Amino acid sequence: MRSVWLALLLPGVAAVALAAQEFHPPPVRSPGDGTRLGLLGFGVRGGIDLSGKTQLVFGVTLDAGNLLTSRFRLRPSGEIGVFNGENSYIGSLEGLYRFTGEGQAATPYAGGGFSLVGHDRCGADPDCPDVWLNVVLGFELHYRSTFNWLLEYHGMGGFRHNRFYAGLTTRRGN
């Protein structure tokens, strides 16, 4: 009789012990943490260059991803400056630190980078193309869920070129 009770009790205890085990999956990193590269958004902008020959400047930017944190962004861009002298052509790569997170009414940022600069008569100019260091200050104003207005200042080439921009930028949802 004891062996019958033991035979019934052992499988019952084992079933309860197995049911009591709880699966704990490994923690999953949120998509906002760490490095994330890819085309996450783009923007268009226009403005003026207040150097000696004031030029009208048009450009496009790409949001190429985050480095180390969701607040540090990689941003390549291209620009064309027209009127008042030779047309200028600029390709830039900048790193921008955003002081607030996503979804704020205003998002200030600052950063820097470098530009490869040319102009219409670059072939005849021994100093062309040139490399400039950039300082960037700006902020985005929330417009729609994935669109922001952009207001920005660029000090370029040792602050010999001071550019002010206004534009519209988008970022794909996280």
Language model features: what each stretch is:
Residues M1-G32, N174:
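Cleavable N-terminal export/targeting peptides
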Residues P31-D33, G47-S51, V82-G85, C122-C128, ...:
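Outer-membrane beta-barrel domain signature
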Residues G32-I48, P108-A110:
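Transmembrane beta-strand segments of Gram-negative outer membrane beta-barrel proteins
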Residues G38-L40, G52-F58, N87-G91, A106, ...:
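Residues that define the transmembrane beta-barrel architecture of outer-membrane proteins
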Residues V44-I48, V60-A64, L93-Y97, G112-F114, ...:
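Residues on the lipid-exposed face of transmembrane beta-strands in outer-membrane beta-barrel proteins
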Residues F58-A124, Y143-S145:
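Gram-negative (and chloroplast) outer-membrane scaffold detector with strong preference
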Residues L150-M156:
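C-terminal binding/interaction regions
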Residues R160-N174:
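Outer-membrane beta-barrel "beta-signal"
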